[in-house]
Amino acid sequence: MSQSSASSIFTVSRLNQTVRQLLEMEMGQIWLTAEISNFSQPSSGHWYFTLKDDRAQVRCAMFRNTNRRTTFRPQNGQQVLVRASITLYEPRGDYQLIAESMQPAGDGLLQQQFEQLKQQLAAEGLFDQSHKQPLPSPAKQVGVITSSSGAALHDVLQVLQRRDPSLPVIIYPTAVQGADAPLQIVRAIQLANLRGECDVLIVGRGGGSLEDLWSFNDERVARAIFNSRIPIVSAVGHETDVTIADFVADLRAPTPSAAAELVSRNQIELVRQIQGQQQRMEMAMDYYLAQRHQQLTRLEHRLQQQHPHLRLARQQTLLLKLQRRLEDSAQNQIRRLSRRTERLQQRLVQAQPQGQIHRYNQRVQQQEYRLRQALERQLNGYRQRFGIACSQLEAVSPLATLARGYSVTQTPEGSLLKTTKQVHTGDKLTTRLQDGWVESEITQIKVAKKPRQRKAAN
């Protein structure tokens, strides 16, 4: 066996693993329509069942976290549409499906077609807001594309009659259900654009099942709505119903009645608006007239102010004011001159020599008196200070001490004798008494004993 052949030998585990990886990578998710059989739900909550047709079958599992989103409980024998991933259970080598979503086959196929067309048209830009046309306000004439015998037309006409009876309505009858309905709807839209009678179109019908509303999920209808030069309001079914026409239309209304309200004006509200505008116009007119009346009054007043008699009276009044001002000015000038003359006379009197001499004499006398008083006060102060100094000197003078019976003895050198150590026998001393001096000679020196000091008690 060659080396290349040996490297291609698989084990069972490797084979199953490789096949699983190939299935998951190459197939990915698929949509599958089939019949359910062998359905079971163990305590784990997962669903296990078989999907089959008349020629083959495949095992399938749907885990609990996924099957919670399913809106129905599958039954054996039920046709379903399943979106699933292909994988392989390696321990047994069985390939199986892991379901991601499930729905009954009828509605499921239609829903799948709806999603595919929606993605296609969205990719082409048919849903972009940049292509949406604004609705006219107000609409001059409304076109309605729907069944002539349906409840939708009755609802639209009833709302328009109630809200805006004067608004013209053109009906383009068409089938809204069945195989021929999409083409009829397309032709009605094209006819309305060809005639150009209306400035807005309502395209819709009443409620129904998904199959009943399927004409408005037709690609031809969607493209006709997109190509319309006239703005289109879609009004298909009830508020919960959503169709491709709703995405393409310039505006979606939840119901035909709501569409009629969107394209019409409320007559009661219109009357209220007109009344409000009339009231505002009346207020504006009243304000305008009041302003003009005030302007006229001001002009009349100005005209009266320009009358010759009034102008003459104003000039006379002005002349009297000027005359009074002139008289007052002359009187003030005279008073100022009089006061100035008086001041000059006073200065002249004060400038005469006799007056100055008299004033100087008075000032000299005053200064002499003040000087005498100052000298007297100063002399008294000196006397007091001298008396105090004498008293203080007398208190510390040695003569005062001698007068009290004491004497002062001096050594031959003239020093005061204070101790026996200063003199010797034969020295001559001079003693000062109160009334003179006495000279003496030392014949004997005696030293006094110091008194004994007592010891302190222990």
Swiss-Prot record:
Catalytic activity: Exonucleolytic cleavage in either 5'- to 3'- or 3'- to 5'-direction to yield nucleoside 5'-phosphates
EC number: 3.1.11.6
Keywords (A to Z) from UniProt: Cytoplasm, Exonuclease, Hydrolase, Nuclease
Any Pfam family the entry gives: Exonuc_VII_L
GO molecular function: exodeoxyribonuclease VII activity; nucleic acid binding
Coiled-coil intervals, chain numbering: none
Intracellular or extracellular location(s): Cytoplasm
Role description: Bidirectionally degrades single-stranded DNA into large acid-insoluble oligonucleotides, which are then degraded further into small acid-soluble oligonucleotides.
Family note: Belongs to the XseA family.
Name of the molecule in the record: Exodeoxyribonuclease 7 large subunit
Organism: Yersinia enterocolitica serotype O:8 / biotype 1B (strain NCTC 13174 / 8081)
Biological classification of the source: Bacteria, Pseudomonadati, Pseudomonadota, Gammaproteobacteria, Enterobacterales
